């Protein structure tokens, strides 16, 4: 826990100005709004049109799972009929109560935040959790709840490709904030905000992936996070902290705190004036990278007023996340407990650290300054300390003074593909479709022999393109000379 009993939440009314036009029109479900009353002792409910559980064919569920404390051991988890029942029926829009409780405890434990709803109680910080069908489901609903057509949205650049169509669908104006190996370049963000055109709508949200960013692999430093958080307070915007790779951190230094953690411990106000209001971070987690991508279980953590609007979107669209997958997830987590869950995540991060090392070793050998490269370095990169991606640029121009803009799309989709290797052109991660020479490569699935072969094929591709360009320039020079 942060131990600061003076920390308190921003009032619910603070978020009124952050709601989108459509969010203000979403209606509460007349049926689901009464679900909690069914649990009142002595109540005979004629409320919901729930199917009779006795007609369901499922009587129990068993599965085996790895034991985090013993790599050679498995544990059988059985969910008997009475405990299986909640997973076979409609459940609360916010999530299965058992899973919500477990995840809330996890957020308290990992991020040091004190849970409590509506700011009631000493030190209570006004946040809660909602379960979604993966974190992207929740991110879309959060943005839809906060951004109206034409509103500007601050997005780190390059940015996770999955949110670009989302912002375009919602007709947002994507304002790019450049990043480097240390995270969002806070000085660039400050400059944009200080020089914002008068009379134009100001941004209400900033979207960022602070650990192992997809695509760049960057992990934001503590100082950068502090600077961004100070700007959020000064210029009044909400940080959308999309953090699927938080538990995949394998750096040599201590993992920097999350924005969600930091806002409750960092001095508040531009000048550190001691203001104690929290609630400018809406955090998104997922079990996809650490338990199973197929579970489609994510969770949003943040101000209750914003979570209420996300839940309204869910209630008016898909009603809820699958009760059964939530129940399976809960029973796995309950059987492990928090300590073994965190032990499991450390093992997962170590798995990816080893994958990272294998990939970088091959990258250095075939495209860096290793024994296989007599032509000098053919690519440049920064090694990630979290996640599963490398972001690198090929050195295709023979003339170091050349300034022509490169685009990796043709290189990858035509030349590399012809040589039997694929990566992702960096252009797809540019919010407004700019060209870029960068390429994203994922190292999560490949065995070492495949990594070596992939790097050999990329090297061949780069050398072929360099040779073709050199020949073309020589030919152009000859033509130019002959015309004199």
Language model features by range: what are they?
Residues 1-33, 191-202, 265-275, 340, ...:
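Eukaryotic N-terminal low-complexity, Ser/Thr- and Lys/Arg-rich leader segments
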Residues 345-360, 364, 373-397:
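Conserved glycine-rich beta-strand-loop-beta hairpin in the small C-terminal domain of fold type I
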Residues 302, 388-402, 423-455:
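Conserved PLP-binding active-site segment of the aspartate aminotransferase-like
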Residues 2-105, 421:
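N-terminal "arm"/small-domain region of PLP-dependent enzymes with the aminotransferase-like
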Residues 413-440, 470-480:
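Conserved PLP cofactor-binding pocket of PLP-dependent enzymes
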Residues 70-236, 240, 246-275, 282-286, ...:
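Conserved core of the PLP fold type I
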Residues 264-353:
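Conserved core segment of the aminotransferase class I/II
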Residues 52-59, 214-217, 247-250, 291-293, ...:
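Short catalytic/ligand-binding loop motif for oxyanion handling, primarily in non-cytosolic enzymes
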